[in-house]
């Protein structure tokens, strides 16, 4: 078993102060590894990076036939909880005759600083629609209604979650050894880094009209690329890097240092895990891989922000930087 390799370095002055190590793969349209760092067989929980897979049964089944690209993007989102996100998810719920109480994700303050500060200023209490996963849960409820299934759609034995597990194992081409309960209360199934890279490559290679699954995959990544602002929000790596890429690339972060990318024009899928769970490490690593693949200009402001981020102190003095390690440079 290969060990994790240094992927991102934190420099203070002339010294490397900290290192984020991890595992990563780039897979081709057949799922074969084109390039790897660390251990491709490392077992991981993909967390929110698996949302495109969790949305797959909804689209593939026909339940999403009348959904807009915005709704599909939100079904894959870890959104900021800004008004542009919550208004659209609330409208989606209203279309189904449902309300905030029908969610099972739980409430939390918006992830986006502006939306969070506004709620604090006005004394507003967060609802479940402010949960960054509320779009995914609206998707689960869409599939629940299509199936005629019960209200407790987060239960691992619920038909919705069984469909998600089946899709997950089919696209990763692995039997999941188990799951953990994610922050939004649904099962998050384990696989290898290679498995997630293989799954993303399948999305990248999918052809619209080939079959229901491939058509669903194309609809999902196209929605993400068309609406990067809905997948995360201003200032977030997913959104800013999708906007910056020179060709369509779908990006999705996951908690605890996970990130995936779908590159449809190249038939490539990327998956990476920073083992200490640091988002700054995962953001830098994915930006570095995108530069390496030639789809992100290293001089683009978004690339510099996440790949070569300047560290400043409270007096705005530059004290160091975040940058890719030699393995990714």
Task: Explain the meaning of each model-derived region.
Residues 1, 69-176:
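Active-site-adjacent helix/loop patches that line small-molecule binding or acyl-intermediate pockets
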Residues 1-41:
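Beta-lactamase-like hydrolase cores
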Residues 13-16, 130, 248-252:
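Short Gly/Pro-enriched turn/cap motifs at secondary-structure boundaries
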Residues 19-24, 138, 165, 256-259:
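Short glycine-rich loop/turn motifs
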Residues 37-45, 75-79, 122-131, 181-187, ...:
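A short glycine/serine-rich beta->alpha loop
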Residues 46-63:
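Active-site SXXK
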Residues 60-66, 97-101, 147-152, 158-178, ...:
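Bacterial peptidoglycan biogenesis and beta-lactam-recognition machinery
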Residues 203-329:
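Structured C-terminal helix/loop/strand segments within mature extracytoplasmic catalytic/sensor domains
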């Amino acid at each position: 078993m290969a060990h994790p390799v240094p992927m991102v370095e934190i420099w203070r002055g002339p010294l490397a102060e900290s290192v984020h190590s991890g595992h990563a793969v780039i897979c081709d349209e057949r799922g074969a590894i084109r390039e790897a760092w660390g251990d491709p067989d490392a077992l991981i929980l993909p967390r929110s990076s698996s949302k495109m897979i969790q949305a797959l049964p909804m689209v593939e089944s026909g339940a999403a036939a009348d959904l807009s690209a915005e709704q599909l993007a939100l079904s894959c989102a870890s959104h900021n909880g800004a008004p542009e996100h919550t208004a659209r998810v609330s409208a989606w719920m209203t279309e189904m005759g449902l309300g905030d109480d029908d969610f099972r994700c739980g409430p939390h303050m918006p992830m986006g600083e502006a939306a969070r500060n506004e709620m604090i200023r006005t004394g507003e209490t967060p609802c479940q629609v402010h949960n960054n996963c509320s779009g995914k849960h609206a998707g689960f409820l869409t599939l629940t209604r299509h199936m005629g299934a019960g209200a407790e759609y987060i239960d691992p034995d619920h038909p919705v979650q069984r469909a998600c597990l089946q899709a997950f194992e089919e696209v990763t081409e692995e039997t999941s050894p188990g799951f953990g309960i994610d922050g939004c209360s649904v099962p998050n199934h384990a696989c290898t880094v290679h498995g997630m890279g293989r799954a993303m490559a399948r999305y990248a290679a999918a052809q619209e009209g080939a079959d229901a699954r491939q058509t669903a995959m194309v609809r999902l990544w196209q929605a993400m690329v068309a609406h990067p602002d809905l997948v995360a929000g201003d200032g977030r790596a997913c959104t800013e890097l999708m906007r910056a890429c020179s060709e369509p690339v779908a990006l999705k972060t996951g908690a605890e240092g996970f990130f995936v990318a779908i590159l449809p024009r190249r038939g490539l899928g990327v998956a990476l895990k920073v083992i200490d769970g640091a988002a700054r490490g995962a953001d830098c690593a994915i930006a570095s891989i995108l530069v390496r693949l030639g789809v992100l200009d290293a001089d683009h402001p978004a690339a510099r922000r996440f790949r070569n981020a300047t560290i400043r102190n409270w007096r705005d003095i530059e004290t160091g930087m975040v940058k890719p390690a030699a393995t990714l440079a």
